């Protein structure tokens, strides 16, 4: 039986102590070093979205292990830029969906919607979903893949894809690299936090981060209160011998955005369309 969540007053002051695992910073530094100097190999193919005021491109770039990652790029029609950019990361089970209804492009921004690898069953799309060739086994879902080797964990792959999207976007003629913000809800919020931190580790300044109910921030507590997916590690630890639970949670903390977030972006003024 899960615990009841906190009351509103407790929630406002809740500041969990999430221990950072040994080697956390070096793990992510090594992840970035692995792709240092590797071209993003960005392609942008015009896509007919049947809209008069917004142009759309089918994006693709080299993500984790140079596997292709996809997304939509939307921008005001017939505008050359450079434009401020919003990169949107999506929630668990999402796909980049259909290329219509970008409120950011309608407001004068460039807007990238990133397809999360291996997901997409929760939303319709006009294109094939970005595949994921995973490196290890685990319980159903993504949280427990390759627990024996964090280098093969799904969220290491996903965060790498997300950060390389930022790197690729900064090189686009359409985009003003000094005015890029990241946006995400739930799993997308976790990605946005991770990208902020990884950007800071590489000296990249972001204009802002818009994060809503981010996923992966306090994994131990989610095991206490969750009743359903995407918290698939809950079913995993249910049958796991008790003596192994602490080790599993310690390894999962290697992808905790609560640990990575304190080194997030130096926010800059001036994120406005023009």
Give, region by region, the residue ranges found by the protein language model.
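Gly/Ala-rich beta-loop-alpha elbow adjacent to hydrolase catalytic centers
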Residues: 184-192
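Hydrolase active-site cap/lid region
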Residues: 191-241
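The feature captures the conserved acid-bearing segment of alpha/beta-hydrolase catalytic domains
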Residues: 220-274
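A short loop-to-beta-strand scaffold at the N-terminal edge of the catalytic core in hydrolase folds
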Residues: 55-77
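Gly/Ser-rich "nucleophile elbow"/oxyanion-hole loop immediately N-terminal to the catalytic nucleophile
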Residues: 141-185
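Short beta-strand element of the alpha/beta-hydrolase
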Residues: 71-75, 81-92, 111
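Cap/lid segment of the alpha/beta-hydrolase catalytic domain
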Residues: 102-103, 107-160
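N-terminal targeting or regulatory segments adjacent to alpha/beta-hydrolase or S9 domains
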Residues: 1-55
């Amino acid at each position: 039986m899960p615990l009841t969540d906190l009351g509103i007053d407790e929630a406002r002051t809740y500041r969990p102590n999430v221990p950072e695992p040994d080697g956390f910073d070096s793990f992510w530094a090594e992840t970035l070093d692995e792709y240092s100097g590797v071209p993003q190999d960005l392609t942008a193919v015009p896509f007919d979205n049947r809209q008069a005021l917004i142009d759309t491109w089918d994006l693709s770039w080299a993500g984790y292990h140079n596997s292709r990652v996809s997304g939509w790029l939307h921008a005001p029609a017939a505008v050359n830029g450079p434009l401020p950019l919003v990169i949107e990361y999506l929630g668990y089970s999402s796909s980049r969906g259909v290329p219509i209804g970008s409120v950011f492009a309608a407001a004068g921004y460039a807007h990238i919607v990133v397809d999360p690898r291996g997901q997409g069953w929760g939303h319709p799309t006009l294109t094939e979903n970005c595949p994921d060739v995973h490196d290890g086994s685990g319980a159903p879902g993504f949280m427990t893949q390759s627990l024996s080797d964090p280098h093969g964990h799904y969220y290491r792959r996903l965060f790498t894809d997300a950060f390389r999207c930022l790197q690729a976007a900064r090189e686009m003629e359409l985009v003003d690299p000094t005015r890029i913000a990241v946006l995400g809800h739930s799993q997308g919020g976790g990605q946005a936090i991770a990208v902020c931190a990884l950007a800071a580790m590489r000296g990249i300044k972001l204009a802002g981060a818009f994060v809503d109910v981010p996923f992966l921030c306090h994994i131990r507590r989610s095991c206490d209160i969750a009743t359903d997916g995407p918290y698939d590690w809950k079913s995993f630890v249910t049958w796991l011998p008790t003596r192994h639970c602490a080790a599993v949670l310690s390894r999962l903390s290697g992808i905790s955005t609560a640990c990575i977030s304190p080194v997030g972006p130096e926010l800059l003024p001036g994120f406005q369309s023009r």
